[in-house]
Amino acid sequence: MKINVRGSTMVRPAEETPRVRLWNSSLDLVVPRFHTPSVYFFRRGEAAAAEGGSYFDGERMRRALAEALVPFYPMAGRLAHDEDGRVEIDCNGEGVLFVEADAPGATVDDFGDFAPTMDLKRLIPTVDYTDGISSFPILVLQVTHFKCGGVALGVGMQHHVADGFSGLHFINSWADLCRGVPIAVMPFIDRTLVRARDPPAPSHPHVEYQPAPAMLAPEPPQALTAKPAPPPTAVDIFKLSRSDLGRLRSQLPRGEGAPRYSTYAVLAAHVWRCASLARGLPAEQPTKLYCATDGRQRLQPSLPDGYFGNVIFTATPLAEAGRVTGSLADGAATIQSALDRMDSGYCRSALDYLELQPDLSALVRGAHTFRCPNLGLTSWVRLPIHDADFGWGRPVFMGPGGIAYEGLAFVLPSASGDGSLSVAISLQAEHMEKFRKMIFDF
């Protein structure tokens, strides 16, 4: 796929904004340090064609973006270090990168089921990290026009500034302004609300921040002298219909007194089971599942509407593979128990635990966290991922623009609201071949 860049602009806030250094909470610092990639796809429908004018007009989008950056001013800043070396946000108004491009030989249909492959990654501007954390924009955007008339909006958002909920709050507010609608909820920019207690008093061991289990099998002899190349990975996406999800639930105990499991717990148990079987994990192999949970409503008192930052706490069910690959009910019970534990007391304890750690960077999750035998499964089902209507209609798809690590997966809702859920996942290529056969075998 050939992409021609029409032009790129650094868009600054439309008005003067506060010149401050924004303190980051521990939750803002235990996230991956790169830009989180996501991509929206839009089809040019009859209504947009009849309206006339320029579809996804760059000038209109830039004006709205500049307006949005006034209340969301940290987005226009740069990362910096305070005197103790802690990462903070320098709200200096230097702006966000906005790129316009064409893919004259491609159509929206060419992306098929929108699996987060390298083709999707090319729809997002590349960030150069070589000159230090203050050298690059916190937010990079690219509007790519296809020959079919459709458009992709690629988003790269530095994770220190926002989690999924806050990131979408910004994107959807920008879209509202672009179609002439005022921002519904203004951002609340004060991260001290998720500061640890004084003095910190963690009341749980917080297994979520403990090292991930390693494979029980010993390293092969050659690994002692030379580091082997990591096995090739594959990325795919699988759509489970409402009927599929119903058939999964039918495997669980029913009737009076039967335990209740969330849809996430049921689907996560199925994905964890399939991945463990595809990986050939022995029954005694410990495996950990990382489940991102939003703390906004879990913390008491709850955070203000529009709280802008990271409020992700992680539930981490841990079990031997034999339990995970057994009945669906066993896996779902393990997951639901971990999720139910995530109340305000647990979350406050997690903040205190993080405050006592000498080096938060040691807790940042990465390839070492999610790789075999472990798994990360992040749900975007409750996020408003399809609400970005810039004035030319809602997206037909929104999802990750890439999956950085083997063993990481995302659950996505359907844009049509048909009750289906899609699982985008990265696994070792040989494991993916088996996973493809298992995911619909129930």
UniProtKB/Swiss-Prot annotation:
Tissue note: Expressed in roots and leaves. Expressed at low levels in stems and seeds.
Active-site residues (renumbered): 159, 389
Acyltransferase listed as a keyword: yes
Main enzyme class: transferase
Annotated GO MF terms: acyltransferase activity, transferring groups other than amino-acyl groups; hydroxycinnamoyltransferase activity
UniProt-listed Pfam families: Transferase (PF02458)
E.C. designation(s): 2.3.1.-
Keywords from the UniProt entry: Acyltransferase, Transferase
Protein family according to the UniProt entry: Belongs to the plant acyltransferase family.
Task performed by this protein: Hydroxycinnamoyl transferase that catalyzes the transfer of an acyl from p-coumaryol-CoA to various acyl acceptors. Can use feruloyl-CoA and caffeoyl-CoA as acyl donors.
Protein name: Hydroxycinnamoyltransferase 2
Species: Oryza sativa subsp. japonica (Rice)
Organism lineage: Eukaryota, Viridiplantae, Streptophyta, Embryophyta, Tracheophyta
GN (gene name): HCT2
